[in-house]
Regions:
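Short coil-to-helix segment of the ABC ATPase nucleotide-binding domain corresponding to the Q-loop/switch region
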Residues: 100-107
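Conserved ABC ATPase signature
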Residues: 140-148
Length: 226
C-alpha cells in the first residue's frame, strides 16, 4: 500500500521584511485507506499543509515522500505526474469548466492521462451513476445546483481511482442538507475504493466521521483523536 509522509516540515513567508512562520516541524504519515482530518482556526496553516503534501507548494524546510520518492528530487513535470497518477482534489468551490458538460468535466483527468477511450467511457458512466449525476451528464455547470456541482467535482477527482484524495473545505459552501449528502458520498467512495482522505475543514459534523483528527495550533500539528 502506498504511503504519503512528511518529515520535519516547516513553511514560512516573508511579508514586508518580516518572516511569518505558518507550520513548524510537522511529521505525518498517511497510508492508502486512512481518513485524516486537519482542523484549526482560519489562517492556522491547514490549506498550506495540504498544498505541500499534494506537491502544489514547497516547504521552507523538511521533506515530503510518496513511497520513499522525495518530492524535492523531482522536476515540475515529475511532480505533475505524481499528482496525475496518485492524487485527487476537491475544494470548497467546485472549479468546474463552465463551457464543458458534466461528462466532459469528469473526463478531464482521464484525458490528461491519455486514457480517454471506450473503456474509460464505461468508467465515467459508472462514476456518474455512483454519485447520482448520470441524468445530468449533458448539462453545463450553470444548470446544476450547488450540491450537484460538488458531486461532479468529486466524480472528477475519483474517476481515476487516486490513492489519496485531498479535500479543502469540501462542504464549506453547502447548506447542511447538501453537506451531509456530500459527506456520505465522500466516505462511501473512500471505503469502496480504498482511497485515503486528507481534509482541511471547519465542519464539525464532517470532522466527527474521520478516524484520525489533527489540529494545527501555534504552527504545530497535534493529534486530538485516533
Amino acid at each position: 500500500m502506498s504511503k504519503l509522509e512528511c518529515k520535519d516540515l516547516s513553511k514560512s513567508f516573508s511579508i514586508s521584511g518580516d518572516t511569518i512562520e505558518v507550520i513548524n516541524n510537522i511529521n505525518l504519515s498517511i497510508t492508502e485507506g486512512d481518513k485524516v482530518a486537519i482542523t484549526g482556526k482560519s489562517g492556522a496553516g491547514k490549506s498550506t499543509l495540504l498544498q505541500i503534501l499534494a506537491s502544489l507548494d514547497s516547504p521552507t524546510s523538511g521533506r515530503v515522500y510518496l513511497d520513499k520518492t522525495d518530492f524535492a528530487s523531482l522536476s515540475n513535470d515529475g511532480l505533475s505526474q505524481i499528482r496525475l497518477h496518485n492524487f485527487g482534489f476537491v475544494y470548497q468551490f467546485h472549479h468546474l469548466l463552465d463551457d464543458l458538460s458534466v461528462e466532459e468535466n469528469i473526463s478531464i483527468p482521464l484525458s490528461l492521462k491519455n486514457e480517454l477511450n471506450s473503456k474509460s467511457k464505461i468508467l465515467i458512466n459508472k462514476t456518474m451513476k455512483e454519485l447520482d449525476i448520470y441524468e445530468r451528464k449533458n448539462h453545463l455547470p450553470w444548470k446544476l445546483s450547488g450540491g450537484e456541482k460538488q458531486r461532479v467535482a468529486i466524480a472528477r477527482a475519483i474517476v481515476t481511482k487516486p490513492k489519496f484524495l485531498f479535500l479543502d473545505e469540501p462542504t464549506g459552501n453547502l447548506d447542511r442538507k447538501n453537506a451531509s449528502v456530500i459527506q456520505s458520498l465522500i466516505f462511501e467512495m473512500s471505503d469502496k475504493y480504498g482511497i485515503a482522505l486528507i481534509s482541511a475543514t471547519h465542519d464539525n459534523d464532517f470532522i466527527s466521521s474521520f478516524e484520525n483528527i489533527y489540529e494545527i495550533s501555534g504552527t504545530k500539528l497535534n493529534k486530538i483523536y485516533e
